[in-house]
Amino acid sequence: MAEVKNKKASVATPEKETVVVQKDKAAALVKPQFNAQVDKRMLVEEVHQQAIFDSILSERASRRQGTHQVKNRAAVSGSGKKPWKQKGTGRARHSSRRSPIWVGGGRAFGPQSVKNYSLKVNKKVKQLAFRSALTMLVNDKAVLVEDFKMDKISTKDLSQKLKSLNVDKLRHVILVSENATVFKSSANLKNVTTLKAHSLNVETLVRADVLLVENESMKLLTERVLGSN
């Protein structure tokens, strides 16, 4: 038995090979590198993660409509008459058929439309978050300032333009433009989100794989960031 144990011990176990599973095919693509001329005053030396987190929470909360509402016992239709007398029937006492414990009665503590979901974030914190998110893109060399000159509405032409920049396969392409032709041309491109300069927010910058900005929009962004300091 001792010899058998020695034989088993002498057998070398093969080394396990590490297998890398690529879940997202788009993540395997090499993003192009852009060196955009961005005013250094728009950037920050240190990215503030907490400011980004607070601003995104505030932006998401502001998008909530808050139109949900249910009927409580005061709003539900029905008689307020007492179903039966208080004593003498042997049954439990009840005050109204509109009580929440009755079928068809009102909802107790249900959601009401008067609730306000907005979260206040200071202006300086919002600006710090915006500049931090922009700094992250600039550090990743994912910002390009270029005019998309389009004489007519054409999704094909815009798609070819994006292909020439090697960004057509990226998942989140953010295009900032004030041109209505560019807006309509990009409407059917699923991976392209077109916004105006005043509509660009922190969450959009954080989710972006690449940020394409026209010169006119870049001037507006610069005024927006530096004008509030």
From Swiss-Prot:
Output one GO BP term.
translation
- Cite the Pfam families for this sequence: Ribosomal_L4
Q: Which UniProt keywords apply?
A: Ribonucleoprotein, Ribosomal protein, RNA-binding, rRNA-binding
Q: Disulphide bridges in this chain?
A: none
Keyword Ion transport found: no
A GO cellular component annotated for this chain's UniProt record is: ribonucleoprotein complex
Q: Where is the composition biased (Basic residues)?
A: 82-97
Task: Tell me which InterPro entries the record gives.
Answer: Ribosomal_uL4, Ribosomal_uL4-like, Ribosomal_uL4_dom_sf
GO molecular function list: rRNA binding; structural constituent of ribosome
Q: Where is this region: Disordered?
A: 62-103
Q: Which HAMAP family match?
A: Ribosomal_uL4_B
Q: Which family does it belong to?
A: Belongs to the universal ribosomal protein uL4 family.
The record's annotation in PANTHER family points to: 50S RIBOSOMAL PROTEIN L4, LARGE RIBOSOMAL SUBUNIT PROTEIN UL4M
Q: What is the protein's quaternary organization?
A: Part of the 50S ribosomal subunit.
Q: Which NCBIfam families does this entry report, sorted A to Z?
A: rplD_bact
Task: Outline what the protein does.
Answer: One of the primary rRNA binding proteins, this protein initially binds near the 5'-end of the 23S rRNA. It is important during the early stages of 50S assembly. It makes multiple contacts with different domains of the 23S rRNA in the assembled 50S subunit and ribosome.
Protein name (record): Large ribosomal subunit protein uL4
* Source organism: Mycoplasmopsis synoviae (strain 53) (Mycoplasma synoviae)
Q: Which gene encodes it?
A: rplD
